[in-house]
Amino acid sequence: METVDCGEAAPRAPQPASIQVHFHHESGLAKLLLGGCSLLQPLLLPRPRATSRALGRHRLLATSWVMQIVLGLLSGVLGGFLYIFSSTTLRNSGAPIWTGAVAVLAGAVAFIYEKRGGIYWALLRTLLALAAFSTATAATIIGAGRFYEYHFIFYKGICNVSPSWRPTGAPTLSPDLERLQQCTAYVNMLKALFISINAMLLGVWVLLLLASLLPLCLCCWRRYRRKEKRDLPLEETVRSE
């Protein structure tokens, strides 16, 4: 009987080790669940009003920077299409190119300053923001002031192939009517393309003006709110007296 008891007690020896390993696995899973709950807790709990306002302002600023980059690229691309046509004031000024370049730089530097910080990036961001506003204003003035130039490019007699030096005399055969109609159709298509490109450029520059004014408006609103909060205790003290 003693040998049987010893034989039965021998395989029961590693049982505490198996229980200990199982306990460690459960504690690791519990830590993982607790860590996930702690990460999800800020998302589930309601945020304070100050934090939500700051987050809203940051989203508006990021949206304005993205708009500056996208609209700057669009301005450069549309400005490149102007070189299809003959020489115009808007094309010769290079307004779409330098306006788009300044807008892209302003948006990119604003994102870099948001990530890195620093006084130099802050100064460069302010300088490029002012430059983006100025260039967009100048480009809008140039584009709106010279919008009528398509009348001089696509004039009525552009498809007239009859020589003007021919002496007046007996009526002759008119030029090929099919070729004249085809030329007129192509000219009308180019005219519509030119007008649409100029209109899109004006729209892009107006949106750039709004995007460059948005950070300034947010800054003024923030200062106004701070001043209002400072003046509120003074008014309460005056009323109490």
Curated annotation (Swiss-Prot):
* Topology class, membrane: Multi-pass membrane protein
> Which key words are in the record?
Membrane, Phosphoprotein, Transmembrane, Transmembrane helix
Location of Phosphoserine modifications? 38
The primary location reported for this protein is membrane
Gene Ontology CC: one annotated term? membrane
The UniProt entry, under InterPro entries, shows: CD20-like (IPR007237), TMEM176A/TMEM176B (IPR009281)
Q: Which parts form a coiled-coil structure per UniProt?
A: none
Q: Where in the cell is it found?
A: Membrane
Highest taxon in the source lineage: Eukaryota
Bilayer-crossing residues are: 65-85, 93-113, 127-147, 193-213
Q: Which family does it belong to?
A: Belongs to the TMEM176 family.
The record's note on quaternary structure and interaction partners says: Interacts with MCOLN2.
Q: What is this protein called?
A: Transmembrane protein 176A
* Gene source species: Bos taurus
Q: What lineage is on file?
A: Eukaryota, Metazoa, Chordata, Craniata, Vertebrata
